[in-house]
A protein has these predicted regions:
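Bacterial N-terminal signal peptides that target proteins for export
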Residues: 1-7
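N-terminal signal peptide c-region/cleavage motif recognized by signal peptidases
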Residues: 14-16
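Core of compact, soluble alpha-helical bundle domains
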Residues: 19-144
Length: 144
């Protein structure tokens, strides 16, 4: 995955397990499936890229690179929430190493995630589940 702050958009990796049909009560299904996750990803990444305080992590990427990042995020979220996708990107610690992401950067990213989930009217339980899982990733993303 290109070095970029994907922060809380990325949830717990499924560890390369083979794709399985999503369980009917999986977070993937409860969020609305692939298309809903893709729409949330697009909005969230757009917010991050245009934010004056954290947009610096998106500078210098080609259109192709940005599309690959987008697809990695979608695949990660799909897989991590119990969907049928297989995430083939690097682990988050490796992907974010050397970027110097601070606690303030992390907190700002979480604010954008919350705003994105509100925009899409994600129900509270799903929002809570997603934010709790995202919180577990902070240790692999924040360096300072």
């Amino acid at each position: 995955m290109t070095r970029l702050t994907l922060a809380p958009a990325l949830l717990l990796v499924a560890g390369g397990a083979p794709a399985q049909p999503p369980a009917s009560d999986s977070l993937y299904k409860r969020l609305g499936g692939y298309d809903a996750i893709a729409a949330v990803t697009d909005d969230f990444l757009g917010r991050l890229a245009t934010d004056p305080s954290i947009g610096r992590f998106f500078v210098g990427h080609s259109t192709d690179s940005k599309q690959r990042i987008r697809q990695h995020v979608i695949d990660f979220l799909c897989s991590a929430t119990g969907g049928p996708c297989i995430y083939k990107g690097r682990d988050l610690k490796t992907s974010h190493a050397g970027l110097g992401i601070t606690k303030a950067d992390w907190d700002r990213s979480v604010e954008h995630l919350v705003a994105t989930l509100a925009k899409f009217k994600v129900p509270q339980k799903e929002k809570d589940d997603l934010l709790a899982a995202a919180g577990a990733l902070e240790k692999d993303i924040v360096e300072k």
